[in-house]
Amino acid sequence: MIMKRLTIIDFVEKYTHEYSELTFLREKVDGVWTETSFRATREEAHKIGAGLVALGLKKGEKVSLLSQGRNLWITSELGILYAGGVNVPLSIKLTESTDLLFRIQHSESRYVIVSEQQLSKIRSIIKDCPLVEKIIVLDPINDYQDNEIAISDIIAMGEEYLKEHAAEFQTLYESIGPDDYANISYTSGTTADPKGILLTHRNYTANVEQGASVIHCDKGDVMLIILPLDHCFAHVAGFYTMMSYGGSIATVPIGKTAIATLKNIPIAIKEVKPMLMLSVPALARNFRKSIETSIKAKGKVVERLYEFALNNAIKYNKEYWNRGGWQAWRYPLVKLFDKIIFKAVREGFGGRMKFFVGGGALLDIE
């Protein structure tokens, strides 16, 4: 039997029905962690998608998305895809106006969705983006310009559109095929102009299916995403994989500055107590450095015991899929040191950690 080649839309429809009332999105709002169900996530994505259609977005047209990680980032991307559009996720780390300008122009984006924090970057270049018809702002602001509209207005437009055109909207999103483009992911452009990588719906869903064979989690498990959502790694190993398991994802609360957001990471870890996290090598090295600094502060004996325990665990686990084997004799030591050393390390990550998934670049075995 040949499996159906799923689109992201197929994927979302399947799992939001299967896990309808389970929590999918977690976000801290005014100091309180809020929960959004699979059903509510789909409903908001439908409204945003229908609102974009009402605004004028046509199938295959591009929408740039520039925002910190948050629930509205995810539902905005899903809304773009439901409307038949192509998301162009932009990194908030892009500070040079020319970097943003190139990507928006090169992708031929017709709309830009942006957070209040990033809005000034778009306003500074919008005069040079003649193809952009509207800027959609994710946060309430006091000074909307003529070409700007609130996401709440898009959602309201979507609600009205669906009252009269629900069947047409369904026909639209059901017409999307696995080989239709879902995303244009730009390279960093450090040595030349950035390259726009065209990714199809099936690129994503196939990767999720492959990733699910490696990342094993349970329904209801929680992942804290500390990586930028514009990165493909965060898409695949992050919210689409967790969606397939009936798990939920939490995003780090947005600070007033990038540094403030970074400081929110350890707070979020303690509050969310995630079972899974994603990391790139540079971030993993920072976590390890922080752990080993704490170990060294406890004295030479503890430091040497930690080093012995770590080396023993590395030799036993190897690449994990081939753990044990002729190193199986190390297993009792692995269990012993897990109780007296590594349990404390896990407690620092909330106490429920199952997987710390590395990717995005070459990851050392250590």
Task: List where the protein language model places each region.
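Structural core segment of the AMP-binding/adenylate-forming
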Residues: Y82-G158
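Conserved AMP-binding
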Residues: S67-R70, S91-K93, L227-C232, G360-L362
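Conserved pre-ATP/AMP-binding loop-to-beta segment of ANL
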Residues: S20-T23, V137, S152, A156-Y186, ...
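A short helix-loop-beta submotif of the ANL/AMP-binding
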Residues: E61-K62, Q68-V88, I92-S97, Q105-Y111, ...
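Conserved AMP-binding/adenylate-forming core of the ANL superfamily
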Residues: F24-R70, L78, T95-L101, A150-G158, ...
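Conserved AMP-binding A3 loop
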Residues: E35-R39, A182-V208
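Conserved AMP-binding/adenylation subdomain of ANL enzymes
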Residues: T205-V222, L229-Y331, K335-F342, R352
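A short N-terminal helical cap/helix-turn-helix that marks the beginning
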Residues: M3-F24, E43
